[in-house]
């Protein structure tokens, strides 16, 4: 419980440091208790980011959420599907939220691969490139692999360092926050905020298990193998 409260405090500071609450207030007024809480949390903080004043409020909000990392990006994307919680106008504005974050280093990528696959399998990977795409959960590298003596071009998707631990700590703290909101602001109970956060946790944890994505690609390849014009990347399960 104390750990969750501490994580919630850190998230609150992160939110308070951004422009999220000010931007949200232009769409929907938050409860007074929330405004007071964020005012307290923002004590001694200076704004860490300068947002272009010439862009829309939705673009500003998307940029703020992106700056706060994976958990808030996923939360924003999920809330787009719940206009009953955030309102039609805000849901429409958040459609522009992009699932992008700065890439982590090639050195970190190699360290993760070696730890997960072992030295022998790692040595079968040749010419691992710098990241070619980076999102909130994982990033992609081009590479060549030695598959039983045959050199093949592949793309390797690697989860961000400590992403599962970080996300689950933050989402559990947000679930605690949802519990507080439902307990003290009675009219929010109809929104089932705890269920919303729990569902987001389940969906994102499934997304972080790349075996499901690989299995889906395999199934799609099998279903379209006789269809002209379809080419599905092969999954190398031995890696």
Spans of features found by a protein language model:
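Conserved ATP-binding/catalytic core of the eukaryotic-like protein kinase fold
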Residues: 152, 162-167
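Residue-level signature of catalytic and energy-coupling elements of molecular machines
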Residues: 76, 140, 156, 213
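Conserved ATP phosphate-binding architecture of protein kinases
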Residues: 139-147
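N-terminal accessory/targeting segments that precede structured cores
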Residues: 1-139, 165-193, 197, 204
